[in-house]
Amino acid sequence: MSLITRLLTASSPLRLRAMETMSRAGYSSHAKYAEHRPIDKIRNIGISAHIDSGKTTLTERILFYTGRIVEMHEVRGKDNVGATMDSMELERQRGITIQSAATYTLWKDTNINIIDTPGHVDFTVEVERALRVLDGAVLVLCAVGGVQSQTLTVNRQMKRYNVPCLAFINKLDRMGSNPYRVLSQMRSKMNHNAAFIQLPIGVESNCKGIVDLVRERAIYFEGEHGMNLRLDEIPQDMRVESQERRQELIEHLSNADDTFGELFLEEKPFTEDDIKAALRRTCIKRTFTPVLVGTALKNKGVQPLLDAVLEYLPNPGEVENLAFVEKEGQDPEKIVLNPARDGKDAFVGLAFKLEAGRFGQLTYLRCYQGVLRKGDNIFNARTNKKVRIARLVRLHSNQMEDVNEVYAGDIFALFGVDCASGDTFTTNPKNNLAMESIFVPEPVVSMAIKPNNTKDRDNFSKAIARFTKEDPTFHFFFDNDVKETLVSGMGELHLEIYAQRMEREYGCPVTLGKPKVAFRETLVGPCEFDYLHKKQSGGSGQYARIIGIMEPLPPNQNTLLEFVDETVGTNVPKQFVPGVEKGYREMAEKGMLSGHKLSGIRFRLQDGGHHIVDSSELAFMLAAHGAIKEVFQNGNWQILEPIMLVEVTAPEEFQGAVMGHLSKRHGIITGTEGTEGWFTVYAEVPLNDMFGYAGELRSSTQGKGEFTMEYSRYSPCLPDVQDQIVRQYQESQGLGQADKKKRKN
């Protein structure tokens, strides 16, 4: 503390102001949160990261400092209350976030809508949904773990939706924390043009505060829960480093921003406002990532992070949101939605999440244009169904606040709206508007599921109906071959969570079978077909002929199915073409080699023939069935399997054992790195070989190793693996035994 500050503190009754101390009361407001605000006073942000990086703890601190909650609770707190945003009992028990939760709060008279998202890879669709409707994000990184597998996934998702972000290096208080290593990983692994705008004053148990490089001041967090901020001079032993890091920040900004670059070349001194303006411009354009530091658990660095959200992340008016106008026979026309909060344009909103609440189905929406009031009618652009708005609510985790109207930029919820995730709503059905939908990854793991008691079947059906509607990555189907019900999802944890929710929320205990991999079947090369379906034995008959070719799609599209109508003339009348496509898609549900779905195939219908009386859509559908059976016999087929990106971290002495086990599981090592007695290995391993790996890793590393994995792509199986899958399928169908009998005879 400087001498002048000390004298002022001792002598003046206004000593808090002299120390430039700020309490949360000066920042937050207990005014009505849902009141209408100008567009520059709104931020829509998400908090995303790898599992256990401290996202939910950070959100809890944000809500506390902004006056939204009166006391803080920890994620796995001893008081058994749990974090505010983890409202589901399972979330509090496991200490993980399963669903993204929405809330809103006020900071310096700005309304901040926050979505806290899961970090676990099995719930990645929750992150997709959140990022689709946000204008900015806070990417939380652990000061020890650094850039981990799910961090890279979230980074890819942010890139897909062009979401500007701030990076917050959390957990400075942990043993082994090294924010400088995390910054270098951000640059090397994530290709971010990133630099510190804050530095830690000490790490681990010596974490005292932070240095603000933009304002060139030290910030200390004092009082109960770090509510009072004291600004002081930068400590003597950090001045050289602070100057060097500030210069580094200026150089990175000058490379990313032309206006700032000109000032840099002219060698003019930079003001605080120059740097802040450049940070805002580059952050919104995604050409630079400001890096902040702190420890949410120890209440340090959260208030400056909130300031940065206001200063550097965009308001809804600074983000360009597009919609597509469907035109018959033409490509959709792109139009830019008007973000002004004046209600002059027709309402346009996107449903990004469905949830069955206590009062019926809850639909989360983001308003992109216009205004929506209670009593208005809106139309679903996909189904054209009309819905009357009886109730509008804003959400705070699992609590609600009724509002009379919402404007462009607001996140809100409706009751009783029948729709799907990614549906567009508008007040003018003639607009033909549709917004870009949400990317949904394919499920990779299936398990057999059945209720323990037959009397619970009704509740089981209700639970399945609700969960499949809420979560597009959770699928349910009945397998006729083995006569069992199956659920599919993004991983074992994903399916286990739903099984537990069935018991807790519906009183329906269920049994899950062993996990099964979602293999796919595809063609190796093109295969032509010419099939005639003819059934004319008196009365109305059936006649259809189709000619064409089935061919593989490129490897990067091997999870898709395509149908192309290349017919010219009237040999195959246009009204019968949908029948051919329907037959193709029906047959694609079950392949010949292993009974799994077909994928990565293009069906090209080139020619055919019809009968003036006996042809029908049904006849052409059956012709497609026959043509595909013909291709099953004549084509070369192979099985595709899901490949996972696996990241294993363990003490150095176990490196050989870990790499040996991954190789044994047909893994391909893609990289390794080591720090301070620990190593991390990155590999690509078939999902089929990863079952049981958790136990093996625990036993081979004395319980010290941990791993994460996420879906990467589908790739052809090894020949011996394919032979084994085909043999097992044939035996399950009784084909193997029949062949053996034939051979004996």
UniProtKB/Swiss-Prot annotation:
GO molecular function, one term: GTP binding
Stretches assigned to the tr-type G domain: 40-317
Subcellular locations according to the entry: Mitochondrion
Sequence intervals crossing the membrane: none
Main location: mitochondrion
Transit peptide, UniProt annotation: 1-15
PANTHER family to which the protein is assigned, alphabetical: ELONGATION FACTOR G, MITOCHONDRIAL (PTHR43636:SF2)
Name of the protein described by the UniProt record: Elongation factor G, mitochondrial
Origin organism lineage: Eukaryota, Metazoa, Ecdysozoa, Arthropoda, Hexapoda
